[in-house]
Amino acid sequence: MADVEVPVLIVGGGGCGLTASIFLSELGVESLLVERHESTSHLPKAHYLNQRTMEIFRQHGIADSVYAVGTPLENFGKVRWRTSLGGDGPLDARTFYTMDGFGGGSLYDLYAADSPCLSSNLPQIRLEPILRRHAEDRAPGRVRFGHELVAFVEDAEGVTATVQDRAADSTYEVRAQYMIAADGGKTWSEKLGVTMQGPSGLLDMVSTHFRADLSDYAD
């Protein structure tokens, strides 16, 4: 007999895993979330939360927590294309174009007519702790950071998983009807045979995390 028996095992404690835990709890479905890292992300990652996302957060009692710490719409409601943020060269610090975006400025009434929820701007490094708190409040003891899935066996009725408590250096067995692979698609998703269809490698993108006083660029 397994040490833990739950309807759903969630592997991964990022945005997807934590929201899955919250939503299942709201539906009265018991789950266990395991995340191999000791804490939520230390990197900003994604930051824009559109109106539909905020509607779902509102439905599950999360929206107010996000709005309380998110960037006010008046501070992110424009998009500006520039050659650079600074520099003294002839092509530095030039603005190509500026437009309202994300429901700010001239777009406010249009966006407000579509939804009772405005969009928000909160980097993942600050969003995930909020989601973790809501998940833990709804499922005490069932959101386990520092616990890593190390093996699983699937059968007709579900999965039997082996989870390692990394701090205690011990393992335990979990039996679940369903397992959600919310680990970012680079580990257990591959082992499950989940593949991406269609063209890949369409473009390269680079994220840069920096601190700067950008007040000179704000209208």
Where are these regions (language model features)?
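N-terminal Rossmann-like FAD-binding beta1-loop-alpha1 element of flavoenzymes
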Residues: 3-33, 38
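Core beta-strand elements of the Rossmann-like FAD/NAD(P) dinucleotide-binding domain
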Residues: 4-6, 167-178
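Conserved structural-core and active-site-/substrate-pathway-adjacent residues in large, well-folded domains
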Residues: 10, 21, 31, 57, ...
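Short hydrophobic core segments
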Residues: 11, 123, 173-184
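Active-site-adjacent segment of FAD-dependent monooxygenases/related oxidoreductases
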Residues: 45, 49-134
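Conserved FAD-binding catalytic core of PHBH/FMO-like flavoproteins
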Residues: 133, 178-219
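General small-molecule cofactor/ligand-binding pocket signal
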Residues: 142-144, 197
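A conserved short coil-to-beta-strand element within the FAD-binding core of flavoproteins
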Residues: 145-160
